[in-house]
């Protein structure tokens, strides 16, 4: 025993860790017996002191941290900014959730770190502080919830609740916080029960993996080691952890300080030597670990190191595997008991913040940092090496060292305030981040109509549903409007865009029956004023419209209907608009019209020269029966070389169109039946039948006449020709008339009779046999191309001839060639003539290289009417076509109040008047999800708001002469819809600037010259591409659009040169909130521009949702969504929430290699990379070996660090060597690839790395394998003992496979011997289970065998090599299962 005088007096607080150190030093110094005597005295002293001080714990001892107030305030400010960005549509829901969690988690962690210094400064003898930080009871997490903040909670599904609990348990929780807190508490109670059983099972699995590992030798002879240094590349290792890693290990290399050797190889490290090495500043120390041991199934004393029980080198025969398994599994049961106290508090892995200690200036070396952005897109600096940051205030200079790969969030020489975040330390990259794929559903906040601002594609697995994939980042908009379902009957009364009174809105989405029409606006459009009395009747009186419907000529009075434009029902397919014409009778009976103008855009949206732009099928040229088309002697030129596809009810046929040069053609009717080959035909060829004769079992003839049967490939054509049969006398006269058309008056001359024909006839010679023939005279339907609707008047030619040289030519096409038969498909009618508009542009222009133009439909709502524009995008040229026009010259003037169903504004005072009451709205028809009933969307005044009036906007009155120079086009006599486009010379798209201030959308528009500035006419509309349309209801004069430029011009006007800032407000444009439309104040709400007037804009309220690529959009474009409907689904990766409660599952996930994306994928990538590079450099055998070795070494170190981190976070100390033994077992296998070794191993077989290496050497051929990471369960089922595997899991399967393969169990492990009742090969039974034989003796045996079976030497070489290697290694290493 040492003398009392030599003892050192330590005056410091002794916590749990210090007591551990004290005990270990006492054992080293005095031995076990004396140490126990000392510890008894310490225990007695402790009880005496506790009794004397009588420490008690009261609620007043829970001291809240003073900095909590401003920390929470700071976090709330950041959350508020984030919420604003989300509201503006700059941040999508998943980003918002992630950032919100990070903000609150960082706040909570900082509070937790502040806790200990706060107690130490204010009240070091606080009972809570003494109790928790000494390790007696409770840990930092629990105290943090008592005096810090409870923080973020997980819900029962493990998802984060993004509303943090800001209070702590000392302050008390609000009602909302209490309910959220109950989630976590319930989760904690359930977890406790489940986890206790899990912990026991984890211990069992761990022991299964390593039960056979026993210390069998003193030294395996390895020369490898693992280098440990206190300053690692990725992180700073604390001195305590460094000492703990080194103590009890054995050195792999000599250590030199200068030229002096201070420690030699195979020396074990004690506390004195470790302290000496640290103080001498040794950079790295190479130590032996279980990873470096050369065996796979056992371990040597030097690689294991000291025994943790008595501090000497471990004894031979020690079952270190079972000790390791229990050391890791046992704290698991401890951890599960702790979960009860803390509940489901989130402790995820996010970045730590470095805050400035006081106000001052920041200084750092700018050459060592690089500008970058954080993961949230904020600008920052990235440092690659340790960076010293100095904070200078008036009298203090404070220095902080920022570790590598961290973000600096402030600039050099910037003034920072106290506690401002100056840097963000990222977690070390050496650990694996556990990630899982999560679906986040975004639900609609309000009812309305869905729009999106980009193209979407159908999700492949939902081709026939309404789920779409977004290809790029874009906004989804929900345009406001309340909907009411309806039956189809209501649509006989209500038309799109009508105003109506709504007595009540049904919240339950029932259909509303008591709707009445307010047809004031409608009557101004197309009805007489006396219609007001008949409002309630529901069927308008169309008597005012003059129309005669002749039965013979089909003379529709198109102009009346076209001008009045009462009900244009646009049937819109994906790329076609049908604009129908209705006869008066059809309108009265609400028939669906049979004909109309179809504007068709090719599916790819590209027009080429001479493309057909629109066509009109006149019902006069429509036939129900089949027949033959004849032009007679008239000419028709095929002007379209490329055959055009025409769609007939889904059946596509190629038709060539022929341009009519003349105004007459003939149709010869015939009845045609196409029958299958096997049909029974009941009539004979060339026989004559009457009407309604049975042709086959189920087909009867509709006309009488001559039967003609033609048998073709796999089908029979049966034709019936109606007409008169004549038997002529002279052949030569008839042959001239065979198959030709005869005009009226020409007679058929016979010897006995002469007959005059009133109509055209078709004479056809028929020859049933070679000698017999007769002539069939068939009736002919004569068609004359009368002036049908003139499509050219829809698009006045003058408009397009000015600058862009667009020509729209009208052609009548006959759809069938001369003499070609026409066939109807399943009782559809056949269109003979089609009136087409062909689009062409001038080839002499300098833009003649333009071979194709893009076209698309633009839907714009203005003045309460939906209009469809077609955009054709030439270079600097547009033509437009408006579907609805309600102010045609014949319909009288419409007052602005009736045109605008939303508001009227008094121009003098600029006072806002709402002309819409709350129960007064506008109907729009929409798709609905359930297709049985359509639904109405009602826009009421609450859904719209007005911007303006813009009093500061001034217009320039320029001299009238310049207007005179520009030709004016009157549209008094032109009938039909008309749109005129004004081209803006330089148009820049708008980009909102992401700032927290007001955002001003300002454009710089340069005018071509001063002549182009004109007085702005009262009302105009701008479509979404910046073109401005003059829609003055009081004016029948349209300014020539290609000589004018219209602008919103602000005040500054220079006399000669005009470059103005102007705000372009496009109709249909979407605005996010907080954009400045006017200069004075930002726009208060987001929405879509609905009406543009001279000094104000009406905007329909809308809410933007930002969505990222790959998000799934539920629903169709313009579909009505109700509040709470699923709008979009995000799929994103999130770090698995590491609850305090989830320490154990994390360990299990690492050991079972269960994480979806992290460990396995990282390992796979690493392996592929190494294998590719190294195989290419070193050749195949070495490449595979070194690639696998490097992969295994890296993954082993990563796994050990990960497991240690989990346990250390819970305050549990486990020696690295225990974890290393487990990890060595789950990383020691390689997977045989399919390419090679088919003669020894099967592809997909798991073998040890050493065995693969040795077998490859013996076989002298390339082995293809790669490292694989097994979980502990798989490793337990892939050992060399089938008895051990069968006693663990799947007993029948394991035994059956072992029997089929003829496996041998060498009974090397403990478990196999226990099962069979033998002596276990550990401890005292260590030497009894081994068979010793000399190397020389075995070699002689093998040689004898080889001589005896020399005949088979060539065939069996592979097996002998394998056996020789097997026996050599087993005898030399005293282990049969080495390979």
Curated annotation (Swiss-Prot):
Cofactor: record remark: Binds 1 Zn(2+) ion per subunit.
Keyword terms: Chloroplast, DNA-directed RNA polymerase, Metal-binding, Nucleotidyltransferase, Plastid, Transcription, Transferase, Zinc
Gene Ontology molecular functions: DNA binding; DNA-directed RNA polymerase activity; zinc ion binding
Recorded GO CC terms: chloroplast; DNA-directed RNA polymerase complex; mitochondrion
Residues the entry annotates as binding Zn(2+): 220, 293, 300, 303
GO biological process: DNA-templated transcription
Enzyme class: transferase
Compartments, as annotated in UniProt: Plastid, Chloroplast
Subunit structure of this chain's protein: In plastids the minimal PEP RNA polymerase catalytic core is composed of four subunits: alpha, beta, beta', and beta''. When a (nuclear-encoded) sigma factor is associated with the core the holoenzyme is formed, which can initiate transcription.
Protein name: DNA-directed RNA polymerase subunit beta''
Species name: Crucihimalaya wallichii
């Amino acid at each position: 025993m040492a003398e009392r005088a030599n003892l050192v007096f330590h005056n410091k607080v002794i916590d749990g860790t210090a007591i551990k150190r004290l005990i270990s030093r006492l054992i080293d110094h005095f031995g076990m017996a004396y140490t126990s005597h000392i510890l008894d005295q310490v225990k007695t002293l402790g009880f005496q002191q506790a009794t004397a001080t009588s420490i008690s714990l009261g609620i007043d001892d829970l001291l809240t941290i003073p900095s909590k107030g401003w920390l929470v305030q700071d976090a709330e400010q950041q959350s508020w900014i984030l919420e604003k960005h989300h509201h503006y549509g700059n941040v999508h829901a998943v980003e918002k959730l992630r950032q919100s969690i990070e903000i609150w988690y960082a706040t909570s962690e900082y509070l937790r770190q502040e806790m200990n210094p706060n107690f130490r400064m204010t009240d070091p003898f606080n009972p809570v502080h003494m109790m928790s930080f000494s390790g007696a009871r409770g840990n930092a997490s629990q105290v943090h919830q008592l005096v810090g903040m409870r923080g973020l909670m997980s819900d029962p599904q493990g998802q984060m609740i993004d509303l943090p609990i800001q209070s702590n348990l000392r302050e008390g929780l609000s009602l909302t916080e209490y309910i959220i807190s109950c989630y976590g508490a319930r989760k904690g109670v359930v977890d406790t029960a489940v986890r206790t059983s899990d912990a026991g099972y984890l211990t069992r699995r761990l022991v299964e993996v390593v039960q056979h590992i026993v210390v069998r030798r003193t030294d395996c002879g390895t020369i490898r080691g693992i280098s440990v240094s206190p300053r690692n590349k990725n992180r700073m290792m604390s001195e305590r952890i460094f000492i703990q890693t080194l103590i009890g290990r054995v050195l792999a290399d000599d250590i030199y300080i200068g030229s002096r050797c201070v420690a030699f190889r195979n020396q074990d490290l004690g506390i004195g030597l470790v302290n000496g090495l640290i103080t001498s500043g040794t950079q790295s120390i190479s130590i032996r670990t279980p990873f470096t041991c050369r065996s796979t199934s056992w371990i040597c004393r030097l690689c294991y190191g000291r025994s943790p029980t008595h501090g000497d080198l471990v004894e031979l025969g020690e079952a270190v595997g079972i000790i390791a398994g229990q050391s890791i599994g046992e704290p698991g049961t401890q951890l599960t008991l702790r979960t009860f106290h803390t509940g489901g508090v989130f402790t995820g892995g996010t970045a730590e913040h470095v805050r400035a200690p006081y106000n001052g200036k920041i200084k750092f070396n700018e050459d060592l940092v690089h500008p970058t952005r954080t993961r949230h897109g904020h600008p920052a600096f990235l440092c690659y090496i340790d960076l010293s940051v100095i904070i200078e205030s008036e009298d203090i200079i404070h220095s902080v060292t920022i570790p590598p790969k961290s973000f600096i969030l402030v600039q050099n020489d910037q003034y920072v305030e106290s506690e401002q975040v100056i840097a963000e330390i990222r977690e070390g990259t050496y650990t694996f981040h556990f990630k899982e794929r999560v679906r986040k559903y975004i639900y609609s906040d309000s009812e309305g109509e869905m729009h999106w601002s980009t193209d979407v594609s159908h999700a492949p697995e939902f081709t026939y549903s309404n789920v779409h994939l977004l290809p790029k980042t874009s906004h989804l908009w929900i345009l406001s409007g309340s909907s009411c379902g309806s039956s189809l009957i209501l649509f006989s009364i209500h038309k799109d865009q009508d105003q109506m009174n709504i007595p009540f809105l049904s919240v339950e989405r029932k259909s509303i029956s008591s709707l009445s029409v307010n047809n004031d606006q409608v009557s101004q459009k197309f009805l007489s004023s006396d219609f007001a009395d008949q409002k309630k009747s529901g069927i308008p009186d169309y008597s005012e419209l003059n129309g005669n419907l002749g039965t013979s000529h089909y003379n529709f009075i198109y102009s009346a209907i076209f001008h009045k434009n009462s009900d244009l029902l646009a049937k819109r397919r994906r790329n076609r608009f049908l604009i129908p014409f209705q006869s008066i009778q059809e309108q009265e009976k609400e028939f669906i019209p049979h004909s109309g103008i179809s504007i068709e855009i090719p599916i790819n949206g590209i027009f080429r020269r001479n493309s057909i732009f629109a066509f009109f099928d006149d019902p006069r040229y429509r036939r129900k029966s089949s027949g033959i088309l004849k032009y007679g002697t008239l000419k028709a030129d095929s002007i379209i070389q490329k055959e055009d596809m025409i769609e007939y009810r889904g059946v596509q046929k190629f038709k060539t169109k022929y341009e009519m040069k003349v105004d007459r053609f003939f149709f010869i009717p015939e009845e045609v039946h196409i029958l299958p080959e096997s049909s029974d035909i009941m009539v004979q060829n060339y026989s004559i039948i009457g009407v309604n004769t049975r042709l086959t079992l189920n087909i009867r003839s509709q006309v009488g006449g001559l039967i003609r049967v033609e048998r073709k490939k796999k089908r029979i054509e049966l034709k019936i020709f109606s007409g008169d049969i004549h038997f002529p006398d002279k052949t030569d006269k008839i042959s001239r008339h065979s198959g030709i058309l005869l005009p009226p008056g020409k007679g058929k001359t016979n010897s006995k009779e002469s007959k005059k024909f009133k109509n055209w006839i078709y004479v056809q010679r028929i020859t049933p046999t070679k000698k017999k023939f007769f002539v069939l005279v068939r009736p002919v339907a004569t068609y004359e191309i009368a002036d049908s609707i003139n499509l050219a008047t829809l698009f006045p030619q003058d408009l397009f001839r000015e600058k862009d040289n667009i020509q729209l030519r009208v052609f009548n096409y006959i759809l069938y060639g001369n003499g070609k038969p026409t066939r109807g498909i399943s009782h559809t009618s056949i269109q003979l003539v089609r009136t087409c508009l062909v689009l062409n542009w001038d080839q002499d222009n300098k833009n003649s290289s333009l071979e194709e133009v893009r076209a698309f439909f633009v839907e714009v709502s203005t003045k309460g009417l939906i209009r469809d524009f077609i955009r054709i995008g030439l270079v600097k040229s547009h033509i437009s076509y408006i579907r609805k026009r309600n102010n045609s010259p014949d319909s009288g003037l419409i007052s602005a109040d009736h045109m605008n169903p939303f508001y009227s504004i008094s121009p003098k005072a600029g006072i806002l008047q709402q002309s819409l009451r709350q129960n007064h709205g506008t109907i729009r028809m929409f798709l609905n999800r359930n297709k049985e009933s359509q639904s109405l969307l009602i826009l009421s005044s609450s859904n719209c708001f007005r911007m303006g009036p813009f009093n500061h906007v001034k217009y320039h009155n320029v001299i009238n002469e310049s207007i005179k120079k520009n030709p004016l086009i009157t549209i008094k006599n032109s009938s039909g819809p008309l749109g005129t486009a004004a081209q803006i010379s330089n148009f820049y798209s708008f980009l909102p600037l992401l700032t927290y201030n007001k955002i001003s959308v300002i454009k710089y528009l340069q005018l071509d010259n001063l002549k182009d500035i004109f007085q702005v006419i009262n009302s105009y509309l701008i479509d979404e591409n910046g073109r401005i349309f003059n829609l003055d209801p009081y004016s029948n004069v349209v300014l020539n659009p290609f000589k004018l430029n219209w602008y919103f011009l602000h005040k500054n006007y220079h006399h000669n040169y005009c470059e103005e800032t102007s705000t372009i407000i496009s109709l249909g444009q979407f605005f996010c909130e907080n954009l400045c439309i006017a200069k004075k104040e930002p726009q208060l709400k987001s929405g879509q521009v609905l009406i543009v007037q001279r000094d104000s804009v009406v905007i329909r309220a809308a809410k933007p949702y930002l969505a990222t690529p790959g998000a799934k959009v539920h629903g169709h474009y313009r579909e009505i969504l109700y509040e709470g409907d699923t709008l979009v689904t995000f799929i994103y990766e999130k770090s698995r929430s590491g609850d305090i409660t989830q320490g154990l599952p994390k360990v299990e996930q690492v050991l079972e290699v269960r994480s979806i994306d992290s460990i396995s994928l990282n390992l796979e990538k690493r392996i592929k990379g190494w294998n590719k590079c190294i195989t290419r450099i070193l050749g195949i055998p070495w490449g595979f070996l070194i690639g696998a070795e490097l992969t295994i070494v890296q993954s082993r170190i990563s796994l050990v660090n990960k497991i240690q981190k989990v346990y250390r976070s819970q305050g549990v100390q486990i020696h690295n060597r225990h974890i290393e033994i487990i990890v060595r077992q789950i990383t020691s296998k390689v997977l045989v690839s399919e390419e090679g070794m088919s003669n020894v191993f099967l592809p997909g077989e798991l073998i040890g790395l050493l065995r693969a290496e040795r077998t490859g050497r013996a076989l002298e051929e390339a082995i293809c394998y790669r490292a694989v990471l097994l979980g502990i369960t798989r490793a337990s089922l892939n050992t060399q003992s089938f008895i051990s595997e069968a006693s663990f899991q799947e007993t029948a399967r394991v035994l059956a496979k072992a029997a089929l393969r003829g496996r041998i169990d060498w009974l090397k492990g403990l478990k196999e011997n226990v099962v069979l009742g033998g002596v276990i090969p550990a401890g005292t039974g260590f030497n009894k289970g081994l068979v010793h034989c000399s190397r020389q003796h075995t070699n002689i045996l093998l040689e004898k065998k080889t001589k005896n079976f020399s005949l088979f030497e060539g065939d069996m070489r592979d097996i002998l090599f394998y056996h020789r290697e097997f026996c050599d290694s087993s005898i030399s290493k005293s282990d049969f299962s080495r390979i």
